[in-house]
From Swiss-Prot:
GO terms for molecular function: 4 iron, 4 sulfur cluster binding; 4-hydroxy-3-methylbut-2-enyl diphosphate reductase activity; metal ion binding. This is 4-hydroxy-3-methylbut-2-enyl diphosphate reductase. Keywords: 4Fe-4S, Iron, Iron-sulfur, Isoprene biosynthesis, Metal-binding, Oxidoreductase. Dimethylallyl diphosphate binds at residues 96, 185, 317-319, 379. Pathway: Isoprenoid biosynthesis; dimethylallyl diphosphate biosynthesis; dimethylallyl diphosphate from (2E)-4-hydroxy-3-methylbutenyl diphosphate: step 1/1; Isoprenoid biosynthesis; isopentenyl diphosphate biosynthesis via DXP pathway; isopentenyl diphosphate from 1-deoxy-D-xylulose 5-phosphate: step 6/6. Isopentenyl diphosphate binds at residues 96, 185, 317-319, 379. The active site is at 187 (proton donor). Its EC number is 1.17.7.4. GO terms for biological process: dimethylallyl diphosphate biosynthetic process; isopentenyl diphosphate biosynthetic process, methylerythritol 4-phosphate pathway; terpenoid biosynthetic process. CDD domains: lytB_ispH (cd13944). It comes from the Bacteria.
Length: 402
């Protein structure tokens, strides 16, 4: 499928919208009331430091809603305002934050149901309004909705669209796209649908496995078993790893994406020589600025003397998980929570350890003066961060009184 031609056709359709409906000022006031925080504004103005009693808060200097998320949520709100009586669907969570998605449900935005792991679009009718989330949607979903005569509101983050352009460039010159990401993440599913031949690698370890196969060959069956869910139909590692281009899920760790790109570059130089590198390797910078800023801020924060870290964001949020990884790699006890409701009753916290299911920790807040690092993922409103801080302050005041 010529995905570029399809996008041009879709974008010129009168049923396609991605720039809002003229309700920006009204919606902006609504979003400020629902998601912004006066406390967080005060902490920012105070040099990202705050002390209450014997609790010192150190806030990362970049955290929370990014521009792409703000844009997506605002456009979803505008859609409801512009289509007050129409049936509105969304193909997936608008962002990975439970409170924001619940708010859309309260606004009568219906989520496409998933049956046996597959989205069921049978309930969508011609004339229905369908929102594409910030992560984007696969080209096949867009095609289905367009052919069904739906009004499509596209909130895809421009940084995600930039990655789509990169894999389309790979496809145009018959390069295989090596995508650093999670094969079952909505963004990577969408990105791979715009690629030609592709292989998805989760981390540097998997990238090394692939590069070793490029240099030395190996067990083809074992390779295919390892990447069975992470490659394009008909993928052949002996045929499809001769010319490769690098792309990434925008929320992955910046440093790891760069390492993977350099690893494949070195591998192709070793295999084919430096003079022929451009025949076998290409790479475009598709690392999201907002992701990079939040990771850089976290790397600065963990250099401070912190007793523990609280990372706030959806449990299925990739960028939030990577912020937690940074804390753990620097030896700081870290608690990943998705809302203030995870704290209490008493000195307990329900949190999600890295790559594990949620669990409960008792007596997580030490009974002494403490310094707590705070950050939040790109899908987390400031209001949620405020609620977490107030819960911590309330818990410490109760502990002090007792």
């Amino acid at each position: 499928m010529d995905t570029r031609a399809f996008k041009r056709s879709l974008h010129s359709s009168e049923n396609y919208h991605r720039k809002g409906f003229g309700h920006g000022e009204e919606v902006n006031q609504q979003l400020q009331g629902e998601y912004q925080s006066s406390l967080i504004q005060q902490i920012r103005a105070n040099g990202y430091r705050w002390q209450q009693g014997d609790v010192t808060i150190r806030l990362a200097e970049a955290f929370g809603f990014c521009w792409g998320v703000e844009r997506a949520v605002a456009l979803a709100y505008e859609t409801r305002t512009h289509f007050p009586t129409e049936r509105i669907w969304i193909t997936n969570e608008i962002i990975h934050n439970p409170s924001v998605n619940e708010r859309l449900r309260q606004m009568a935005v219906e989520f496409i149901p998933v049956v046996n792991g597959v989205k069921d679009f049978s309930g969508v009718r011609p004339g229905d309004v369908v929102i594409l989330p910030a992560f984007g949607a696969s080209v096949q979903e867009m095609q289905l909705l367009n052919e069904r005569g739906c009004t499509i509101v596209d909130t895809t983050c421009p940084w995600v669209s930039k990655v789509w352009h990169s894999v389309e460039k790979h496809k145009k010159v018959s390069f295989t796209s090596i995508i650093h990401g999670k094969y079952n993440h909505e963004e990577t599913i969408a990105t791979s649908s715009f690629a030609g031949t592709y292989l998805i690698v989760l981390n540097l370890e998997e990238a090394r496995y692939v590069c070793d196969y490029i240099l030395h060959g190996g067990d083809r069956a074992a390779f295919m078993a390892k990447f069975a869910k992470a490659c394009s139909p008909g993928f052949d590692p002996d045929r499809d790893l001769v010319r490769v281009g690098i792309a990434n899920q925008t929320t992955m760790l910046k440093g790891e994406t760069e390492q993977i790109g350099k690893l494949f570059e070195r591998t192709m130089i070793q295999k084919y020589g430096p003079d022929r590198l451009n025949e076998h390797f290409m790479s475009f910078n598709t690392i999201c600025d907002a992701t990079q800023e939040r990771q850089d801020a976290m790397l600065s924060l963990v250099k401070e003397p912190l007793d523990l870290m609280v990372v706030i964001g959806g449990y299925n949020s990739s960028n939030t998980t990577h912020l937690q990884e940074i804390a753990i790699e620097h030896g700081i006890p870290s608690y990943h929570i998705d809302s203030a409701d995870r704290i209490g009753p008493g000195n307990r916290i329900e949190h999600k350890p890295l790559h594990q299911n949620p669990t409960v920790a008792e007596n997580w807040l030490p009974d002494r003066p403490i310094t707590i690092g705070i950050t939040s993922g790109a899908s987390t409103p400031d209001k949620v961060v405020e609620e977490v801080l107030n819960k911590i302050f309330a818990l410490r005041s109760v502990a002090t009184v007792s």
